[in-house]
Amino acid sequence: MVCRALVVTLAIGAAALPAATQAYDIKAKTPETAFSGKQRPDILGISADSTADSARATLDSFFKGRSNATSDIQQQKFGNTAVNFISALNFSLPAGPGQNGEVLSSSFSSPASGNRLYFFARNLTFAKEQQPAKADMVREVMGKYGAPTIVGDQHLYYIYRAGSIVSVGTKYKEATAIEAIGKPLDPKAALKLNGETIRGSCVAVVKRAQTKEKVLAAMLSEAKGANCDGVLSVQLIPGTAPDRVGIAQFSLLDVKRVISAAAIDNDAMAAEQSERNASPKGSAPKL
C-alpha cells in the first residue's frame, strides 16, 4: 500500500513539475564567423569550427597524463529550461623546473547558436632553461598563420575582414617581422588599418577582450564597434634575455560570431520565455 501511494505521489509530482524541469527542444542555428575557407586559424587544433564538446575532447587529450593539470568546466542553464550547456573551459598546468606552464581558456555560445567557440586564449610560460629564441618563435607563428597585418609592441596581429587577413601595405617577411616586433606599432600602419572609419580598433578590442568577462553580453558592445570581423593576436614577452621569449600569449577572437551568436541566443531566449509565459488557449464552453 505504501509502495502504491509512493508511485501515485511521484506520478502526480512529475505532472506538476514546472516547465523549466521538462525537456525543451532547441532548434540550433549556425552563427556567422569571421573565418572561412583556408582562413581558419586554430590554436592547438581549436578554431571557430569547434563546439564546446569537441574543444573539451581536444583539451582533455592535450593534458592527459599530466597529474598536476587542473580543469574548470563551466556550465549554465539555457534560460529557464532544464538544458545545461558548457559555456567556458579553463585548463591550466603550473610552470616548474623543466616544465612549461599552460593556461587555456575558451568561451562558447548557447546551444541555440550551436554551442560554438567565439574566444580562445593560450598563455604559455616557458621554463627558464627552455625559453626559445624570439626569432624562432616569430618564424613558427608565421609558418602556421602566414604574414601578419601589423607587427610591433611585442605583438603580431592578424586582422580579418571578409574572410581574409587585412593588409595595410607592409608585406611582412620573417626578417622584417623579427625586426619590427620589438618596436612600437607603426602609427601610419594603424591609421591605414582604421581607414576613414570611426569604428573601434581591433587591436584595442582584442586587448580588452583578454581582460574582461568572456560572456557574449559583456563583449557585444565592443564587438559591434570594432572595425574588423576577427582577430588573432600573438604576444611574445621577453624572457631572461631580450632575444628570448618568456611568455607567449595567443588570443583568437571571432568578432562576427559574438554579434551573430548573441542575436541568435537572445531571440531563442525570448522565444523560450514567450512560450513559457504563453496565455492559456482555452475557450469558454457553451452554456
Give the role of each language-model region.
Residues M1-C3:
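N-terminal secretory signal peptides that target proteins for export/translocation
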